[in-house]
């Protein structure tokens, strides 16, 4: 090879390496392509790479070299393929996260043509060199895999070098698509782990770390890289709160540890001590620091950088004070199992502290017991990956689901606040020989090494453990404060299950969240499915990957209980839980390699239940009274009705405007004779018309809300508002979280922050103020010296407490519904 400016003999990772033109991989490190590329990168002025796919393991190996080159001003271009989905999204996100837009990263974009090049081109001051061969960017291909690559210089073969390089330039400039954030998100959202990836993983598993010394044990991997990138991007856009919705298996605690690593003082909140102890280990591994403490029980650490606190302790008012922590004490707060954040003690913590960023973590963000958690994080969900997506991406094992017809009759069982009573279920299950036989029969049919059965009560769990043990299947019952004949401590039960001293654990609410047993190969649903959230939590307990585990068997014993048709909808990842679709379960799309099989008797049952279903109006009214019962027989506001209403019913409301109570809530309450005396006065006067305008005014954008809030004025309602008052309300509204995104299309956060008061006011006048005057049925008028005014005949009603309550409720509900709708539209991209 003719003389180049590239380095020749160097130490790489303390290993003496001599430059060579022939690389064959295998066991001779001197023949690893990885080391030769590092040598070439040391003095390169420009780097061009074309490979058919990128793997996270390979990108991670080259990151430091890329960074060093970029910091020297080196231009880097990478062209890769998206054919068959072999390029891992995490590899692309890793480049974006660590190198930003300094690398020109593109996909080859010709769908009808195969794409299999593997070439690395380095340009120096006096010449260039090119590697041609078989290595894509993966750890195996760069190191010990049998990969043949050859290097030659433009000085020795100018003609052929020129042919390769000019072809690269043509492909890069004319047959590619830039991998920007939108393209990357699309690719990741649609990416399914290809079948060939399993074979690639065998050879690409980072097990030979001594060979390369480039792996770090605790570092972001897979979906964590994507989530970290999204969180950083979200904060750059002004977000101070965010929710990460991620199925079991991606390592949410480690994600929080990585994301919070740059912050000095961190608070981690969870509801169980064992979760806090596990989290402390994860944070210690990432931070490499002993500077952490606990805040629960008798431990009240306040002087450490990272505090792990139980919600039951920290959530007390006595501890939420300057004596322990000031509101600004923590820079970063993590709320684990964020679906609990609607509860009172969580709310105290969330409302007291003012961190730079608050991160919520959950696998099941849907409203727990009807409560809305998205509002707590300002409807900001930087990253989400559903159970279905996690299976499609190979993060979880597939399931084989068997819906088994159970003749148990639930028709006479009483419902309390929409749920079956524990006592009634016990009387139905315990001693039910036919049901024992059914469960045992199917357990034996799909016999497992390690199974988990979900029961309705302690007595039910004890009864099932006794029944199975008597039939020769060693089993235990796990529940809180256990003292039964077959009961066992949870940790001891897991140990026995892993050692195969027992075959089945029957549990009550002890394995719904926070505890996984990766070795489980069967879960059994032995009680009615009443909540999509609980169903997903319980299913998720068995979906963790484990050596030798190909899939999870799911046995679901379904009877004629309410919501019997939920299972197929949950399994398919359907967000709209319309139980009428249960009969069409074969038409639903399930995760890759999953199987769903329903007993034919169940299809008949679903059809029968469908015929008995209520009309839309009847369902809404029934839901209203259920919510009222939850509120101790108090008439719910719009916000409360939304908050506690089942998603399926709310979706009906949104689809059927005529029956939607949120569009004419006072009329809805009047029909049910639920209005108070003062509300009756409003209803039979001009107040009813004005309230209807606020309920139904068009909301394609959110601009009208800050104008209406300026009138509301924290309950001291104004008849007119000045430009200064409008401007204050307007900026306060759009400065909150990421609300600024609704200010204008294609505007960046930096541009928004530079906007002047004059520009803000101009926008307010030209849009919402103009349209309120034009479409507000004459209630909004011009008045000299003011930006906008209310019609004079409203003066008599604005002092009524009933009107103030109605206006506040409407503004809160409509603002919340707008951002909920925006989030749902964004999540479908």
Model-identified regions with their sequence ranges:
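Walker A/P-loop
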Residues: 236-259
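Conserved helicase ATPase core of P-loop NTP-dependent helicases/translocases
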Residues: 277, 294-295, 299-302, 319-321, ...
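PLD/PLD-like phosphodiesterase catalytic module centered on the HKD motif
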Residues: 1-221, 225
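Conserved interdomain linker/interface between the two RecA-like ATPase lobes of SF2 helicase motors
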Residues: 381-452
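Conserved segment of the helicase C-terminal RecA-like domain
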Residues: 532, 541-575
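A short beta-strand element within the Helicase C-terminal
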Residues: 132, 504-529, 534-537, 541, ...
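Post-DEXD/H (motif II) to motif III coupling segment of the RecA-like Helicase ATP-binding lobe
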Residues: 340-401
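Long, largely alpha-helical accessory region at the distal end of helicase-like NTP-driven motors
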Residues: 187-220, 425, 435-441, 445, ...
């Amino acid at each position: 090879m003719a003389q180049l400016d590239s380095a020749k003999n160097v130490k790489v990772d303390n290993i003496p390496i001599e430059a060579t033109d022939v690389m064959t991989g295998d066991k001779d490190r001197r023949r690893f392509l990885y080391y030769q590329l590092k040598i070439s990168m040391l003095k390169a002025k420009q780097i061009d790479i074309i490979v058919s796919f990128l793997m996270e393991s390979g990108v991670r190996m080259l990151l430091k070299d890329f960074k060093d080159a970029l910091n020297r001003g080196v231009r880097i271009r990478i062209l890769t393929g998206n054919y068959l989905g072999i390029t891992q999204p995490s590899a692309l996100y890793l480049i974006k996260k660590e190198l930003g837009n300094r690398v020109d990263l593109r996909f080859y974009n010709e769908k009808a043509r195969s794409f299999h090049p593997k070439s690395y081109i380095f340009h120096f001051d006096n010449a260039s060199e090119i590697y041609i061969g078989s290595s894509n960017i993966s750890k195996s291909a760069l190191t010990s895999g049998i990969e043949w690559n050859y290097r030659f210089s433009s000085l020795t073969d100018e003609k052929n070098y020129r042919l390769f390089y000019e072809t690269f330039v043509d492909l890069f400039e004319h047959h590619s698509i830039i991998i920007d954030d939108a393209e990357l998100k699309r690719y990741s959202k649609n990416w399914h782990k290809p079948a060939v990836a399993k074979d690639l993983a065998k050879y690409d598993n980072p097990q030979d770390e001594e060979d390369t010394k480039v792996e770090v044990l605790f570092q972001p991997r897979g979906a964590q890289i994507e989530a970290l990138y999204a969180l950083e991007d979200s904060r750059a856009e002004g977000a101070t709160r965010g929710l990460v919705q991620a199925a079991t298996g991606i390592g949410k605690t480690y994600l929080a540890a990585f994301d919070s690593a740059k912050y000095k003082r961190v608070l981690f909140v969870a509801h169980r001590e064992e979760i806090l102890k596990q989290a402390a280990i994860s944070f210690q591994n990432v931070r490499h620091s002993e500077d952490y403490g606990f805040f629960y029980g008798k431990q009240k650490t306040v002087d450490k950088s990272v505090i792990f606190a139980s919600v039951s302790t920290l959530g007390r008012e006595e501890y939420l004070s300057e004596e322990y922590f000031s509101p600004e004490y923590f820079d970063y707060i993590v709320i684990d199992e964020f679906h609990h954040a609607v509860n009172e003690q969580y709310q105290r913590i969330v409302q007291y502290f003012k961190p730079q960023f608050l991160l919520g973590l959950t696998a099941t963000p849907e409203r727990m017991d009807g409560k809305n958690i998205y509002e707590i994080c300002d409807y900001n969900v930087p990253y989400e990956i559903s159970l279905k997506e996690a299976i499609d991406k190979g993060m979880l094992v597939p399931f084989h689901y068997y819906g088994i017809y159970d003749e148990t009759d639930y028709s006479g069982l009483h419902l309390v606040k929409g749920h079956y009573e524990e006592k009634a279920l016990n009387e139905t299950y315990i001693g039910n020989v036919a049901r024992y036989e059914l469960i045992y029969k199917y357990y034996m049919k799909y016999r497992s090494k390690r199974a988990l059965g979900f029961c309705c009560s302690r007595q039910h769990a004890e009864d099932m453990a006794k029944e199975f043990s008597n039939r020769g299947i060693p089993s235990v019952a796990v529940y809180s404060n256990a003292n039964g004949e077959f009961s066992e401590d949870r940790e001891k039960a897991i140990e026995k299950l892993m050692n195969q001293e027992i075959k089945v654990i029957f549990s009550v609410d002890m394995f719904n969240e926070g505890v996984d047993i990766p070795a489980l190969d069967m879960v059994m649903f032995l009680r009615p499915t009443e909540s999509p959230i609980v169903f997903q939590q319980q299913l998720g307990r068995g979906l963790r990957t484990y050596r030798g585990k190909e899939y999870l068997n799911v046995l679901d014993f379904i009877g004629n209980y309410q919501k019997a048709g939920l299972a197929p909808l949950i399994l398919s990842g359907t967000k709209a839980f319309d139980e009428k679709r249960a009969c069409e379960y074969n038409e639903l799309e399930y995760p890759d390699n999953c199987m769903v099989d329903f007993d034919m008797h169940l299809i008949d049952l679903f059809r029968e239940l469908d015929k008995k279903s209520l009309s839309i109006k009847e369902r809404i009214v029934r839901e209203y009274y259920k919510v009222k019962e939850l509120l101790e027989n108090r008439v719910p506001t719009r916000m409360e009705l939304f908050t506690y209403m089942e998603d399926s019913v709310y979706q009906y409301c949104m689809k059927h405007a005529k029956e939607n109570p949120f569009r004419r809530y006072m009329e809805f309450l009047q029909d049910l004779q639920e209005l108070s005396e003062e509300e009756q006065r409003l209803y039979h006067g001009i107040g009813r018309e004005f309230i209807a305008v606020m309920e139904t005014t068009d909301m394609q954008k959110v601009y009208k809300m800050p104008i209406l809030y300026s009138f509301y004025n924290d309950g001291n309602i104004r008849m007119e508002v000045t430009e200064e008052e409008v401007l204050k309300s307007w900026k306060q509204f759009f400065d909150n979280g990421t609300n600024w995104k609704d200010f204008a299309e294609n505007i960046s956060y930096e541009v928004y922050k530079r906007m002047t008061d004059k520009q803000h006011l101009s926008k307010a006048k030209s849009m919402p103020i103009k349209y309120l005057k034009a479409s507000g049925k004459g209630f909004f008028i011009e008045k000299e010296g003011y930006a906008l005014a209310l019609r004079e005949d409203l003066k008599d009603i604005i002092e009524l407490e009933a009107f103030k309550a109605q206006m506040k409720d409407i503004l809160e509900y409509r603002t919340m519904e707008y951002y909920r709708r925006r989030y749902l539209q964004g999540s479908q991209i």
